[in-house]
């Protein structure tokens, strides 16, 4: 899912992250193999913006707290950040709210991408509606093969510079942590305890979808984190596992 190839290392460096073993986090992009959708189908989705431009995705946890990826918030000032909620378009509609503070997981590592989760506190509360809703955190990981969806405004191909204005989504299937780390796929020991994977042929999240929601069974099960390319065969998208990091989110929200 959110994946850069090595040629995009300059982008990651510009955004303040280091790259784990040639596998890059996605910082600006589109859903690969996806379909345009509306925010009413994914009302917990927000666009995290730096200086008014889409940077990453995120999920509404409470009316004042957003869950996103820690790698989205490296070397960035709070004053440059805002979120847009309640719109199918990252650049218009809905509401924009300034960020008052954020906290990255203390155990986050840009080298290994372990604990890639963060919470954002908003300067004012969101008003919930049909297009702005919170989503519950998973308390356990879904089984291997479970149906899931991922949404965002990320690039639609690996290495692309352009992003769509309208929200995109793809349906994927969960790949359990143990299976994702097995010889079936190409990651091996790069898959850690706080990660979960998802895949579908020709479909994935990509640059710019980072921090966005992986949803299964109506709850947030993953946060778009990293991967090898976008929709590359043998390399599922890798997500921060919300069930494994739930206690940290609740404690810091």
From Swiss-Prot:
Gene3D superfamilies: Trypsin-like serine proteases (2.40.10.10). Its EC number is 3.4.21.4. SMART domains: Tryp_SPc. Residues 31-253 form the Peptidase S1 domain. The record marks 204 as: Required for specificity. CDD domains: Tryp_SPc. Keywords: Disulfide bond, Hydrolase, Protease, Secreted, Serine protease, Signal, Zymogen. It is found in: Secreted, Extracellular space. The active site is at 71 (charge relay system), 116 (charge relay system), 210 (charge relay system). This is Trypsin delta. The keyword Protease applies. Disulfide bonds join 56-72, 180-197, 206-230. One of its GO terms (biological process) is proteolysis. Transmembrane segments: none annotated. Pfam families: Trypsin. One of its GO terms (molecular function) is serine-type endopeptidase activity. Residues 23-30 form a propeptide. Belongs to the peptidase S1 family. Residues 1-22 form the signal peptide.
